[in-house]
């Protein structure tokens, strides 16, 4: 995030400098009369027509990314969070995801295709309020667990560079893996270097690119250094990061993997075994044999039932006895009964993990902690998807012209629904690939245009342009209103 602040300043300043303004008319479509900017424009204009191919490549990759990282991932977070409430509505988790996915996709469609600006304004008002509530809730939890903070920070650092379990490798390998995840999730959080945010900042009403760049560099600090750090520490101080909860295990689901304990206690990924024998709920495997894992953590016991609510370990019913066949994704009991789902203690991940942390951390004050996360996820995810639809349609216009906007938005809505029902690991994997493909041309352009960036900055500071902005604001405040005149 610290490095991203400099990157964000650079790309936004360049985008403001090289942006295009399309003049619309009263009879024209809504998307005309707007500003278009972003890396594709400063690549083409700043580096010259010989680099047009890279601008096209960037726009194409960012348009694909808008379907995934900024859309499918967001929908997946919402459905993954709300699927925990499937029992309340008498639905299985997947059906709940389908229902929620359809609702989210419908909301996004109404906003980006129907152009209902009131919903956009509502989100613009509510989202900052929810952000404040989320941060306040996190700060309250940390204050209530202040004595645990030093140990929490120590745990974060220790597990990052010398983990007890969960990933493969040691030494330099584990450092690289830690750095990769940090960069991936940091970029996902603040978009620094990705080239998406400059598209939005290009539309800002200012004649000073540097002033907009300064505003933009605050974003990585706020949403990553502050919000993400609060989230991470809340997860650690409440202890949920290392806890298991009763879980409905889809034996062929996207959260399933197989792990085997290697040297130094590190858990590594392995191909699934042919079968796993389970006696009285406990898997009987030899040392070095891959074991069933959920969210990358080994599941120690399996049950065929779980009482209504399925909230605590005491709710588990009837330990499973039989054989699990990973290739088929089914478990066959000794009496011949086939199960596609079993129950067992498993770790949480993603938004449900954060939800669990807030629920536990704020439990002394009431049972509404998890609700903060649910509402925050719902509002943030939908507003983020709507924002990314704008990024993508600017790319579509750059590549194909205005006629491509409506087809693009149709595909965007479809991808929103598909992302909501796809396995979490799959959505993230594809999103990370697309994310990497847009970063490369953008960073090349930023480095190549660093001289021009310095020229823009020197001009701004030599003119002391910020003083003019202050004077203009002061004159605006002192000017008589129409009523006074």
Task: Explain the meaning of each model-derived region.
Residues 6-49, 199, 241, 245-251, ...:
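Flexible loop linkers connecting adjacent transmembrane helices
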């Amino acid at each position: 995030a610290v490095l991203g602040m400099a990157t964000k300043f650079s790309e936004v300043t360049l985008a403001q400098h090289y942006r295009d303004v399309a003049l619309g008319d009263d009879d024209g479509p809504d998307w005309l009369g707007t500003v278009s900017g972003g890396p594709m424009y400063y690549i083409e204009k700043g580096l010259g027509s010989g680099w047009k191919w890279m601008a096209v490549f960037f726009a194409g990759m960012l348009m694909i990314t808008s379907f995934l990282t900024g859309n499918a991932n967001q929908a997946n977070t919402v459905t993954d969070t709300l699927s925990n409430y499937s029992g309340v509505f008498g639905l299985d988790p997947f059906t709940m995801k389908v229902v929620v996915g359809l609702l989210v996709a419908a909301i996004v469609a109404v906003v980006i295709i129907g152009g209902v600006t009131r919903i956009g304004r509502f989100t613009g008002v509510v989202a900052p309020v929810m952000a404040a509530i989320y941060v306040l809730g996190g700060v309250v939890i940390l204050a209530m667990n202040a004595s645990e903070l030093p140990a929490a920070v120590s745990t974060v650092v220790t597990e990052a560079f010398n983990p007890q379990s969960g990933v493969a490798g040691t030494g330099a390998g584990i450092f690289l893996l830690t750095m990769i995840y940090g960069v991936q999730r940091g970029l996902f959080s603040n978009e620094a270097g990705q080239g998406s945010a400059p598209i939005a900042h290009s539309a800002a009403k200012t004649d000073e690119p540097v002033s907009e760049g300064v505003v933009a560099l605050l974003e990585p600090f706020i949403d990553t250094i502050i919000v993400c750090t609060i989230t991470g520490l809340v997860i650690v101080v409440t202890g949920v990061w290392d806890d298991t909860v009763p879980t409905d295990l889809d034996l062929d689901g996207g959260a399933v993997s197989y792990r085997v304990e290697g040297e130094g206690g590190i858990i590594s990924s392995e191909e699934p075994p042919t079968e796993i024998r389970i006696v009285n709920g406990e898997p009987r495997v030899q040392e070095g044999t891959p074991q069933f894992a959920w969210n990358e953590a080994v599941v120690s016991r399996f049950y065929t039932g779980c009482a209504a609510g399925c909230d605590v370990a005491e709710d588990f019913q009837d330990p499973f006895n039989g054989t699990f066949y990973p290739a088929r994704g089914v478990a066959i009991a000794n009496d011949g009964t086939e199960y596609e789902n079993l129950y067992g203690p498993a770790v949480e991940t993603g938004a449900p993990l954060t939800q669990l942390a807030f629920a536990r951390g704020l439990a002394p004050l009431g049972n509404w902690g998890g609700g903060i996360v649910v509402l925050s996820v719902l509002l943030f995810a939908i507003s983020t998807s709507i924002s990314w639809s704008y990024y993508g349609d600017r790319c579509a216009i750059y590549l194909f012209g205005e006629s491509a906007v409506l087809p693009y938005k149709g595909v965007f809505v479809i991808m929103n629904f598909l992302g909501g029902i796809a396995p979490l690991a799959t959505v993230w994997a594809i999103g990370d690939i697309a994310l990497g493909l847009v970063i490369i041309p953008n960073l090349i352009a930023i480095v190549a245009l660093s001289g021009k960036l310095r020229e823009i900055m020197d001009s701004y500071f030599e003119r002391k342009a910020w003083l003019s902005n202050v004077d203009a604001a002061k004159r605006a405040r002192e000017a008589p209103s129409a009523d006074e005149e």
